[in-house]
């Protein structure tokens, strides 16, 4: 394959992996450990 094609596929896979990890952290089981800054701050 062309090196540009391999580079494009590699970049796309890395981008999808980072997006999947962010969605998993935001909405999956690890989200129970996330704090809400609005609840933590009292005016």
UniProtKB/Swiss-Prot annotation:
It is found in: Cellular thylakoid membrane. InterPro entries: PSII_PsbN (IPR003398). One of its GO terms (cellular component) is plasma membrane-derived thylakoid membrane. It is a single-pass membrane protein. Its main location: membrane. Pfam families: PsbN. PANTHER family: PROTEIN PSBN. Belongs to the PsbN family. May play a role in photosystem I and II biogenesis. This is Protein PsbN. It comes from Synechocystis sp. (strain ATCC 27184 / PCC 6803 / Kazusa).
């Amino acid at each position: 394959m062309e090196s540009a094609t391999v580079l494009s596929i590699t970049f796309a896979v890395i981008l999808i992996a980072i997006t999947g990890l962010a969605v998993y952290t935001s909405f999956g089981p690890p989200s129970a450990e996330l704090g809400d800054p609005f609840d933590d701050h009292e005016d």
